[in-house]
C-alpha cells in the first residue's frame, strides 16, 4: 500500500549509506544546495536506458537525438548483439533506425558511468532492476527515472517509493503522459517528468525539450504513477467492454478512474496529475490507439482468450494484466471503493464471466458526492467581515 506523501520517505536503505543530503531530504528541511550534491552535475551527458522493449527503445532514440551519450541495455547478450548488428529493433519498434551515437549492450554491463538511468521495465520487474543497479556500480550522483505504469508487488507500492527507499527520494523521478513509442520517435509526445526534487524534474524536462519532446514538470510522482496505473486499467476495461457499446466502454473506464482517484486523494496525490497529461491525456491517447497493448488485451479477454496467452498473442508484455489485480487489492486494503477495478481483476483471472462484468459496469452507481449546503447571503456577509478583520490583525502581527 502506498503511504501518504505528507512527509518524505525514509532515505536510502540500499547499497549506499544515507549521506547528509539524503538525511536532510528525509527530514523535509533540506536546502536545494544540499540536495544537488547527490544529483547529476550541470552538463551531465550520459544516459542508460534499461529495457529494450518498444518504449525503452524509443526513449533511447529520443535521448540520443537530444544530445545525450545514450546506452540501451537489452535483457540478454543475444538480444543486444542482434540490435547492434541490425541497428533496428525489428521485434518491438520496426522501421526506426537506431542513431549512430546510440550504444547497445546487455544489462550485465552495469551503469557505473551513467548520469541518468531510465528504467523502462514493467513494475513487476522493478525489484530485479533495483538489484541489478546495486550490483552495477550505480554512482552517487546518478538519477533514477522510472517509466513503469503500475504498482510494485507484493504490497502495491508506487515505483518511485520503492526506488526512493533504496536510493533516496531526491534522486528518483518518474515519467508519465501519452507517449506511444512509434509516434514519439516520429512526431514527439506529451511527457510529464515528476520528482520530489525540483532541480531533477526541471533537468529532465530540459533534456526532453532539447530532443523535441514536450515535457511538463511535476512535484507529484505518486499522483503521476497512480494516473498511469489507472490509465492502463481503464484502457484494458474499455477494450474488454467496447463490443457491448461505446457507452459501456466509457462507463468502465470512468468507474476505474474514479476509484483510483479516490484512493490517490487519500495518499496525497494532486488533482492535476489525474486530469492532466499523465491521466486523462494518456487515457485518451490509449483509447484512440488501435495498437495499444492494454486496449488490445481487453479485446482479447472479451473474445475469450485466457490472460496467460495474451502476451504471446500480442508479442509484448501487457502490464495491466498483472497490475490490475494488485491495484484492486491495494484500493480494497485502503478501505476504498473498488467494485469495478476488483471485477476487472476477476475477469482477468477467469473468475468472472464477461456478461457478468458488463452487467456490473452498466448497473454500478458510484457513491454520491457530499452535498454542501449553500450558506445564506447574510452568513456570507458576516463571514467576509470576520475574514477581513482577522486578516487585518494577522497582517499587523506579521509586520511586527
Tell me what each language-model feature is.
Residues 53, 57, 77, 104-108, ...:
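Electropositive phosphate-/nucleotide-binding environments in soluble metabolic enzymes
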Residues 231, 235-239, 265-279, 283-400:
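NAD(P)-dependent Rossmann-like dehydrogenase/reductase catalytic/cofactor-binding core
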Residues 146, 171-176, 215-219, 275-276, ...:
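General beta-strand structural signal in soluble alpha/beta enzymes
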Residues 125, 136, 162-171, 188-273:
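Internal alpha-helical scaffold of NAD(P)-dependent oxidoreductase catalytic cores
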Residues 2-3, 7, 13, 28-96, ...:
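NAD(P)+-binding Rossmann beta1-loop-alpha1 motif at the extreme N-terminus of oxidoreductases
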Residues 98, 104, 109-188, 204-205:
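Rossmann-like NAD(P)(H) cofactor-binding subdomain of soluble oxidoreductases
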Amino acid at each position: 500500500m502506498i503511504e501518504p506523501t505528507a512527509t518524505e520517505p525514509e532515505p536510502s536503505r540500499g547499497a549506499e549509506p544515507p549521506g547528509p543530503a539524503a538525511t536532510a531530504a528525509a527530514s523535509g528541511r533540506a536546502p536545494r544546495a544540499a540536495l544537488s550534491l547527490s544529483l547529476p552535475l550541470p552538463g551531465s551527458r550520459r544516459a542508460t536506458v534499461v529495457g529494450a522493449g518498444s518504449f525503452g527503445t524509443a526513449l533511447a532514440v529520443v535521448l540520443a537525438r537530444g544530445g545525450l551519450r545514450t546506452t540501451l541495455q537489452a535483457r540478454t547478450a543475444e538480444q543486444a548483439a542482434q540490435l547492434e548488428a541490425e541497428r533496428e529493433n525489428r521485434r518491438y519498434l520496426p522501421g526506426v533506425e537506431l542513431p549512430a551515437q546510440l550504444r547497445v549492450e546487455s544489462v550485465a554491463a552495469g551503469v557505473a558511468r551513467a548520469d541518468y538511468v531510465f528504467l523502462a521495465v514493467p513494475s513487476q520487474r522493478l525489484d530485479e532492476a533495483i538489484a541489478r543497479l546495486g550490483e552495477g556500480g550505480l554512482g552517487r550522483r546518478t538519477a533514477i527515472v522510472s517509466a513503469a505504469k503500475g504498482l510494485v508487488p507484493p504490497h502495491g507500492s508506487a515505483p518511485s517509493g520503492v526506488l526512493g527507499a533504496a536510493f533516496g527520494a531526491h534522486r528518483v523521478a518518474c515519467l508519465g503522459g501519452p507517449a506511444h513509442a512509434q509516434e514519439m520517435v516520429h512526431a514527439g509526445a506529451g511527457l510529464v517528468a515528476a520528482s520530489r526534487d525540483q532541480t531533477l524534474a526541471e533537468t529532465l524536462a530540459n533534456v526532453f525539450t532539447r530532443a523535441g519532446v514536450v515535457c511538463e514538470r511535476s512535484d507529484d510522482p505518486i499522483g503521476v504513477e497512480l494516473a498511469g496505473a489507472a490509465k492502463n486499467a481503464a484502457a484494458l476495461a474499455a477494450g474488454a467492454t467496447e463490443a457491448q457499446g461505446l457507452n459501456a466502454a466509457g462507463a468502465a473506464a470512468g468507474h476505474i478512474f474514479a476509484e483510483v482517484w479516490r484512493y490517490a486523494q487519500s495518499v496525497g496525490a494532486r488533482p492535476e496529475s489525474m486530469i492532466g497529461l499523465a491521466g486523462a491525456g494518456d487515457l485518451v491517447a490509449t483509447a484512440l490507439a488501435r495498437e495499444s497493448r492494454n486496449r488490445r488485451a481487453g479485446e482479447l479477454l472479451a473474445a475469450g482468450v485466457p490472460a496467460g496467452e495474451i502476451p504471446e498473442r500480442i508479442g509484448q508484455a501487457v502490464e495491466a494484466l498483472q497490475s490490475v489485480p494488485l491495484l484492486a487489492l491495494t484500493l480494497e486494503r485502503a478501505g476504498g471503493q473498488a467494485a469495478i477495478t476488483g471485477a476487472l481483476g476477476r475477469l482477468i483471472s477467469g473468475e468472472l464471466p464477461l456478461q457478468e462484468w458488463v452487467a456490473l459496469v452498466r448497473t454500478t452507481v458510484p457513491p454520491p458526492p457530499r452535498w454542501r449546503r449553500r450558506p445564506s447571503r447574510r452568513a456570507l456577509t458576516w463571514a467576509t467581515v470576520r475574514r477581513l478583520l482577522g486578516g487585518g490583525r494577522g497582517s499587523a502581527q506579521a509586520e511586527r
